[in-house]
Amino acid sequence: MKAGLDGGVSQHYIPLGMESQTQAARGRPREFDPEKALAAALNVFWRRGYEGASMAELTEAMGITKPSLYACFGNKESLFRKALDLYERDKLCYIKTALEAPTAKGVAERILRGSLAIQTGTTDPHGCLGVISTVACTAQAESIRDEVIARRASSDAALAARFERARAEGDFPESIDPQALVTYLSAIMQGMAVQAGAGTPREKLEQLVETTLTVWPGK
């Protein structure tokens, strides 16, 4: 990154007020941390959903101006995609670890408990960003809904492959369809996300997890 007019802009920060040389010349530009700004945007999207989050709410939470948002992150859709990347990296990392469990039931347990922890935590909004943003999407935000669905499909494919392996290893009966098991698990998780977002107590959702594991086929 080029140095600012005062010759000392850190490479870790993006200056505000650089929309024109005239503005910059009037005083030292303000600075913001893109990672912190993106985390703030994620929080807004998580609470409000894609369409429910207004540009005014986003810029206020991020502590930046609208021109600076566009310059750093692109439009609202582009910002949401970046927030979704951050969400998957920081909040859904438990899924990759879950796939390494020695049994299919162990995979399901890690996923369900990881999902419950994220959806009912004390520091983040309740519910699931993907579910919130697809359920509430209108036709105008179809590309966002398609993006979230495509990402979920990729995750489901990895889970289906793990369950295929589990069936081949005799982890559960041959009559069980791995893809149907993925659909079942996804339905439980999405239902849990909707209930968490609506304020259902964590204890109730823990009962749902326990019941799901009790009726889980196989070992």
Describe each region flagged by the PLM:
Residues 36, 40, 44-78, 82:
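Helix-turn-helix
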Residues 82, 95-126, 178-185:
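Hydrophobic alpha-helical connector segments
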Residues 27-29:
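Arg/Lys-rich, glycine/proline-spaced intrinsically disordered segments
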Residues 40-41, 166, 182:
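Small-residue (primarily alanine) positions within well-ordered alpha-helices
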Residues 107-108, 122-146:
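Amphipathic alpha-helical segments used for helix-helix packing
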Residues 2, 126-132, 174-195, 207-215:
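Hydrophobic alpha-helical segments that form the core
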Residues 85-91:
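Short, basic, alpha-helical segments at the C-terminal edge of helix-turn-helix-like DNA-binding modules
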Residues 1-24, 110-118, 153-157, 161-169, ...:
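C-terminal peripheral helix-coil segments that are non-catalytic and often amphipathic
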